[in-house]
Amino acid sequence: MKRVVTLVSKEQAEVGHRFRVFSVPDECKSCRLFSVCLGRLTPGRSYKVVEVRPSMGQRCKITDSEMVPVVVEEAPIVGLLPLNKALEGVVVTYEDECAGCEGCPNDVVKKGEKVKVVKILGRKKCRNKEFAIVEFFVVSAPSHAVLDSSKTAQAPSRAPSSRRPLK
């Protein structure tokens, strides 16, 4: 899994500590440390600290706490997928089929994103449908066609604008 160096509070700087980034406060975006702190992480994703590096004395502009450089890797998301998509090692398109069911990951995964199933944990029934409870990672963003499905793309015509009879 991809590893990223970022900053966390001294209290979180412990190997094995897991955390989730819910959103990025506006105050962070103007901070000089943003690009090496929350700017490297994706809101909605969970991370696990795998290495702690020596502190360089940076302080958080919001909490005024000491920030410590750490290496994190994205932790898998646990959620529901239809049984026909729940195969370990397979990359599938998330289509939000479980919307409205408890355990549906639509708060952290967008419709159209490609996800890689890493582990099947069990089964769950919701609205008379069977789902698999799985661990997965998001591997790519949704395609433009899914993001903007209200507009239909049409390829330009290759036919000549007027046909004249051949002589």
Curated annotation (Swiss-Prot):
InterPro entries noted in UniProt: UPF0179 (IPR005369)
Superkingdom in the source lineage: Archaea
Cited Pfam families: UPF0179
Family the entry assigns: Belongs to the UPF0179 family.
Designated name of the protein: UPF0179 protein Pars_2336
Species of provenance: Pyrobaculum arsenaticum (strain DSM 13514 / JCM 11321 / PZ6)
